[in-house]
Design a protein with these regions (language model features):
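C-terminal single-pass membrane-anchor helix
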Residues: 228-285
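Short N-terminal segments immediately surrounding and downstream of signal-peptide cleavage
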Residues: 19-36
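Sec/Tat-exported extracytoplasmic proteins
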Residues: 57, 120-135, 206, 210-213
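Sec-dependent signal peptide recognition
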Residues: 1-7, 262-264
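Acidic/polar residues at beta-strand termini and the immediately following turn/coil
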Residues: 38-42, 122, 126, 149-152, ...
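Secretory pathway targeting signatures of secreted, lumenal, and periplasmic proteins
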Residues: 35-38, 43-112, 116, 161, ...
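Hydrophobic h-region of N-terminal signal peptides that target proteins for export
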Residues: 8-17, 274
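Short, well-structured beta-strand
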Residues: 84-93, 134-223
Length: 285
């Protein structure tokens, strides 16, 4: 059976679940509101928050996704909600993936940007058929920024522009921060007005995210550490489209499919979130 990326909506339509019930559930989560550094993923990385942020970690982040999505297919390590400041209403989702050290030498041969966009558009339409009642259909319009690899900071960036069935427009900017044991997928969700480029949107987020000592990309030990079955180019193609890159090789492609890397998460900015955020910030000290 053909696999497609899973595309998720960040909030339910007014015809769906009761908003007060959602608020009650969200208020029971263990929101970290103090501006400080928080360890995640068994101390393998640290997120430093500002006074503008609410943070949930581990199982609480997974529960947040379940409350907002109605399923348990996506389990991040952390999620940040911007409750004030210049990026108010934007959100950041962090997921650490331990797949082994990723080499960068396959980037050029596996990144076909035009074909990738076509596959993303088709996959999103197909996924809409699987969406539960009360969730808005999503549509991808274009690259907001084509995928590129910054070898200086060992990070891949790309961004998608789209809209939902209510004609609310959104941008999803993604960074893959490479580490010794794999990568961290960092997803920024906001409005087109807040977006200039993936690097600009994600730069302060990446500056406040650090692998712990011993887990950084430069800490890799050749001949000792595990190496991923595919390079970063094949991985990005898979993450973006739900398909294996043609040049990745049969064994590498099989490994990617076995680990279900094709889950791509779209959490579009919608204006119903402002109402939820207002309720939550009543308790912010």
């Amino acid at each position: 059976m053909k696999s497609f990326p899973l595309i998720f909506a960040i909030f339910l339509t007014q015809a769906s679940a009761n908003q007060e019930e959602i608020i009650t559930k969200l208020q029971t989560l263990d929101w970290k509101k103090e501006a400080t550094a928080y360890a995640i993923a068994d101390d393998k990385a640290t997120i430093t928050t500002s006074e503008n942020d609410f943070l949930v970690i581990g199982e609480q982040a997974s529960e947040y996704m379940f409350i907002m999505q109605g399923h348990k297919n996506y389990k991040p390590d952390a999620a940040i909600l911007r409750v004030q400041g210049p990026e108010v209403d934007s959100q950041v989702i962090y997921t650490i993936n331990e797949i082994g050290y990723l080499t960068q030498d396959d980037w050029g041969e596996n990144i076909d940007k035009d074909q990738m966009l076509k596959d993303i558009i088709e996959g999103t339409i197909e996924t809409n058929k699987q969406r539960g009642e009360g969730y808005l259909d999503l549509f991808v319009d274009s690259w907001a920024q084509e995928p590129f690899l910054n070898k200086k900071n060992n990070t891949v960036y790309w961004a998608i522009a789209g809209h939902d069935a209510g004609d609310n427009k959104f941008i999803n900017a993604k960074a893959l921060k490479l580490g010794r044991e794999g990568y961290t997928e960092i997803l920024w969700i906001g409005s087109p007005e807040q977006f200039t480029s993936s690097e600009t949107a994600l730069e302060p987020i990446l500056a406040n995210y650090d692998y712990s000592e011993g887990f950084q990309y430069a800490d890799y030990i050749p001949g000792q550490d595990s190496v991923a079955a595919a390079g970063v180019g094949a991985l990005v193609y898979k993450l973006a489209t739900g398909k294996a890159a043609a040049k990745a090789g049969i064994l590498a492609a099989a490994a990617i499919f076995a680990k279900k890397f094709w889950l791509i998460i779209f959490l579009p900015f919608v204006y119903g979130w402002k109402w939820i955020k207002k309720k939550l910030t009543k308790n912010k000290e």
